[in-house]
UniProtKB/Swiss-Prot annotation:
GO terms for cellular component: host cell cytoplasm; host cell nucleus. Transmembrane segments: none annotated. This is Non-structural protein 1. GO terms for biological process: symbiont-mediated suppression of host cytoplasmic pattern recognition receptor signaling pathway via inhibition of RIG-I activity; symbiont-mediated suppression of host gene expression; symbiont-mediated suppression of host mRNA processing; symbiont-mediated suppression of host PKR/eIFalpha signaling; symbiont-mediated suppression of host type I interferon-mediated signaling pathway. Homodimer. Interacts with host TRIM25 (via coiled coil); this interaction specifically inhibits TRIM25 multimerization and TRIM25-mediated RIGI CARD ubiquitination. Interacts with human EIF2AK2/PKR, CPSF4, IVNS1ABP and PABPN1.
Amino acid sequence: MDSHTVSSFQVDCFLWHVRKQVADQDLGDAPFLDRLRRDQKSLKGRGSTLGLNIETATCVGKQIVERILKEESDEAFKMTMASALASRYLTDMTIEEMSRDWFMLMPKQKVAGPLCVRMDQAIMDKNIILKANFSVIFDRLETLTLLRAFTEEGAIVGEISPLPSLPGHTNEDVKNAIGVLIGGLEWNDNTVRVSETLQRFAWRSSNENGGPPFTPTQKRKMAGTIRSEV
């Protein structure tokens, strides 16, 4: 198991604990409480996948955060916050790629939380890359504008977009939707890669083959989700 995956989970558990304390003191608004509930479900799922106890992970996460805060000077903290709080908009796709109409021979649509996943299940044995335009804050994907799947020839064969009726989504929502899209495309023997920018800010890591760091268990689950919907 990758040590970065474990430490990220541990820190996320502790930060969720801190946010829970804020909520318990009636200091959180409705969106804050909604994210808290969503992230709780996400942490339970990640803990089950990683085989880690959430309570133990929270304690270790606290130690990691305390060590970082102890080592960081006030000036370094101010500089980090100044850069991190500035939201950035990153673009894998051109305006033409974002606005281009596309058609599906065998359309498939699935709602994944507050996101809509669409794909053409007629596509087989293709090399596909996922590109996205999104905003980033704290070096993590904040809001997805649009994600599209392209073949090497430039044809659009899949898409993930926010649902207008369900505004607001989390980084985990986006990763789950990407998992659904990848699972559906790989079911037809396509090879799917994720853009380096998307890997960096959605997963904070990258694989040499361009794929997101899904575990074998997660991949089987994604494929099963698509098969059950077909």
